């Protein structure tokens, strides 16, 4: 079993030194989608840039995610797929993470659900054509999908994927396309300290 780490960045990740023990592990495959690939200078990131890219901007990154999933899915050894931002750093050893992921059913995915706010529903969901056809869930933008769920996602019709490509902050909703299936645990695979960010913003 190998774990695909899907890096979605502007260019270089912020703290590459924390990833040294991870990137050398034989049970990892790395895939990078950078908005500015020519600015990527970290050797292991440059080596693992995917060939096809999508235009991205804040709140519009789902197409890039799908390209990462599609590229990583081509390797049949990849069983788990974890989305990573440029600000992420490992907080557990890879061995601990690997044991944790192996301890569950191979089909299990980990997606942390969030509450859909009134703003989400009125300004993000209802502004999209044919929104009534989808049973929405909201979730953290970083998660871990199993190969089973990645295949289900990639098999969705183009118009269903396009809906989330065009949706503002669609990266927090597009797992709605697979939410009806089994083997999904409401669990956060990453830790986001938004309270610290809020404090910093208030100080500016």
Each model region followed by its residue ranges:
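ER/Golgi luminal nucleotide-sugar-dependent glycosyltransferases, focusing on the catalytic module
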Residues: 1-204
């Amino acid at each position: 079993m190998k774990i695909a780490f899907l890096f979605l960045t502007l260019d270089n990740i912020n703290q590459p030194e924390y990833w040294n023990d991870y990137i050398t592990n034989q049970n990892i495959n790395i895939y990078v989608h950078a908005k500015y690939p020519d600015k990527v200078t970290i050797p292991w990131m440059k080596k693992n840039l995917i060939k096809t890219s999508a235009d991205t901007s804040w709140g519009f990154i789902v197409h890039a995610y799908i390209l990462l999933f599609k590229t990583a899915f081509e390797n049949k050894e990849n069983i788990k797929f974890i989305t990573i931002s440029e600000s992420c750093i490992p907080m557990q050893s890879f061995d601990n993470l690997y044991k944790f992921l192996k301890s569950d059913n191979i089909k299990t995915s980990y997606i942390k659900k969030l509450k859909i706010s009134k703003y989400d529903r009125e300004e993000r969901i209802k502004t999209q054509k044919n929104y009534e056809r989808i049973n929405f869930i909201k979730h953290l933008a970083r998660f871990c999908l199993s190969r089973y769920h990645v295949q289900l996602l990639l098999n969705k019709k183009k118009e269903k994927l396009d809906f989330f490509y065009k949706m503002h902050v669609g990266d927090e909703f597009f797992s709605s396309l697979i939410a009806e299936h089994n083997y999904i645990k409401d669990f956060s695979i990453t830790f986001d300290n938004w309270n610290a960010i809020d404090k910093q913003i208030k100080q500016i």
